[in-house]
Swiss-Prot record:
InterPro entries: Cytidylyl_trans, KdsB, Nucleotide-diphossugar_trans. One of its GO terms (biological process) is lipopolysaccharide biosynthetic process. It is an enzyme of class 2 (transferase). Belongs to the KdsB family. It catalyses: 3-deoxy-alpha-D-manno-oct-2-ulosonate + CTP = CMP-3-deoxy-beta-D-manno-octulosonate + diphosphate. It comes from Methylibium petroleiphilum (strain ATCC BAA-1232 / LMG 22953 / PM1). Keywords: Cytoplasm, Lipopolysaccharide biosynthesis, Nucleotidyltransferase, Transferase. This is 3-deoxy-manno-octulosonate cytidylyltransferase.
């Protein structure tokens, strides 16, 4: 199965300026991400940058990159432009690997691409893993997803979901008392067909998307389906803040450790 990985890379992060270029063990973070993607089954890996500095940094390390406009409202909009610049056919499966995930598991990238290829009724594929602590379940920065019997997303929310009414009524808040099956944490990895990526920016934003600040809710709002791969493993940490960056640097440089990988 052939697919393309696109990595959106925007320099204007408010919490961590020039984030794609942050040094981790001697390499820009976006290069770490690209190398993980290149270890997957992707036929093509391209960084979609908004600044020539990112394009040049990628070129120095043998990573393909292209320059996109700076005024895109979302990463999906940036990838839609990249699909046009690369002249990808509408049927091409495109996996959106976030540029701040230097520990992304290549096998998880493959799993998302394969899932979408096997689910023609879905316009997107994504991933999740089981939540095993109440603190994570109640954390609004942890996005939860609920799926139907066919493994398709019913909804995403920052709120605890599904709400375990009887357990909470009984005061069962310890980690071992979470519902069975356990709630799922959404992993921000997406697979699309290029044709849908081109159509996505034309879909009107939804009220619930704005309330939750979750872009994927627009897809469900407009009646489309998202397939969800449930990974047995928790993904490695992403990088949003200076503290996150220090944590990943320690994993990759100081200790040489990495999170375990999903079996292919």
């Amino acid at each position: 199965m052939s697919f393309t990985v696109l990595i959106p890379a925007r320099l204007g992060s408010s919490r961590l300026p020039d984030k794609p270029l942050a040094d981790i063990a001697g390499l820009p973070m976006v290069v770490h991400v690209a190398r993980r993607a290149l270890a997957s089954g992707a036929a093509v890996v391209v960084v979609a940058a908004d600044d020539t500095r990112t394009v040049e940094a990628c070129a120095r390390h043998g990573v393909r990159a292209l320059l996109t406009r700076r005024d895109h409202a979302t990463g999906s909009d940036r990838l839609a432009e990249a699909c046009d610049l690369l002249a990808l056919p509408d049927s091409e499966i495109v996996v959106n690997v976030q540029g701040d995930e230097p520990l992304i598991d290549p096998a998880l990238i493959d799993a998302c691409a394969r899932l979408l290829a096997e689910r023609p009724e879905c316009v997107m594929g994504t991933a999740a893993h089981a939540i095993d602590t109440v603190a994570e379940f109640e954390n609004p920065n942890v996005v939860k997803v609920v799926c139907d019997a066919l493994g398709r997303a019913l909804s995403f929310s920052r709120a605890p979901m599904p709400w375990w009414r009887d357990g909470y009524a009984a005061g069962l808040r310890q980690a071992t008392a979470l519902s069975d099956p356990p709630p799922l944490r959404h992993i921000g990895l997406y697979a699309y067909r290029a044709g849908f990526l081109r159509r996505y920016p034309k879909l009107a934003p939804s009220p619930i998307e704005t309330i939750e600040s979750l872009e994927q809710l627009r897809v469900l709002w407009h009646g489309e389906r998202i397939a969800v791969h449930v990974s047995p493993l928790r993904p490695g940490p992403g990088v949003d803040t200076p503290d996150d960056l220090a944590r990943v640097r320690a994993l990759l440089h100081d200790t040489g450790q990495e999170p375990p990988r999903e079996s292919g």
